[in-house]
Amino acid sequence: AAINPGNSGGPLFDLSGQVIGVNAQIETMNIQAGGVPGNSGVGFSIPASVVNKVVPQLIASGKARWSYLGIQGSSDFTVEMAKANNLAEPRGAYVAGVQPDGPAAQALKGASNLDDQNAEVPIGGDVITAIDGEPIDDFDDLLSYVALKTEPGQDVRLTVLRGGTEQEVTVTVGERPNRD
């Protein structure tokens, strides 16, 4: 939906009248001669699920805490990556790296060839296929679950493929550090 200047902070409704987000900003671009900014008609909103999680924390303590596992991956789990890792399909969240002092350091394995400049695709990393029994189709599913359905200090059960074998590991979710 187009958001005009001055609408930031207002609710974004769906056709049923439900609040689905809070308008946050608009995309502006130089659309007129002379470089005068104009509204491109593209708006960005904070999803209601994020607002519902953050606002009570801000009211209570003045800051929001976010969960994290301390892993690296991307939403680009390709067919080539799956084949290189002896998997039938690119389904799940591929763990490319694990932060050495992060929450998942003892439980998950990252790719073994990330330092190899000649490596075409990462190999050897775990693939997370479920968290607490919820299927994970890609890294974005994992990020959303961790951010919106967990709290720092909570244990989560991860179903992983490691070397082609399915197993379960438990990780205590950490609190994402500030990036001041």
Each model region followed by its residue ranges:
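Active-site loop architecture of trypsin-fold serine endopeptidases
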Residues: 1-9, 13-62, 66, 179-180
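C-terminal recognition in membrane/secretory proteostasis and scaffolding
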Residues: 14-19, 53-180
